Regions:
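Extended, low-polarity segments enriched in aliphatic/aromatic residues
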Residues: 1-133
């Protein structure tokens, strides 16, 4: 609900206008861990790397237009592997194609999600990409 979303986005700060980006990313990882712990091995993670905007999905139609080209669809039974592969594919794009998205990820401490997921033993950051055409 509204209160839970506010706590997640503000790292449970009493001042909802100031919060730690790093703590927000850790909250996101902890939320994902609760879900993965509940479902166990009965879950598959799918990342669709298409129409990627620098804004959160929650921005809806107000989101900035996509500036990163479509990459594809990734799937795994390992949440950390699929997220690491997604970041690696974005960061491997030519500078002009990745600049805006990479800057947003780095300036918002988005990579902290991956390192914290590893600290929480949520998966493996090593992966093998298998292309299906």
């Amino acid at each position: 609900g509204r209160i839970g979303k506010a706590k997640l986005h503000t790292a449970d700060s009493s001042n909802h206008w100031e919060y730690s980006q790093e703590r927000f990313m850790e909250n996101m990882a902890e939320s994902a861990k609760a879900t993965t712990d509940f479902f166990g091995k009965q879950i598959i993670y799918i990342n669709v790397l298409r129409n990627m905007s620098v804004d959160c999905d929650c921005a809806g139609l107000a989101a900035a237009p996509p500036t990163t080209p479509d990459i594809g669809i990734l799937a795994s039974t390992d949440i950390l592997a699929v997220d690491q592969a997604s970041i690696d594919l974005v960061f491997a794009l030519p500078d002009a194609a990745k600049h805006d998205l990479q800057e947003r990820i780095e300036s918002r401490r988005g990579l902290r999600q991956l390192s914290y997921m590893k600290e929480l033993s949520m998966g493996n950051d090593q992966y093998e990409l298998i292309t299906i055409e």
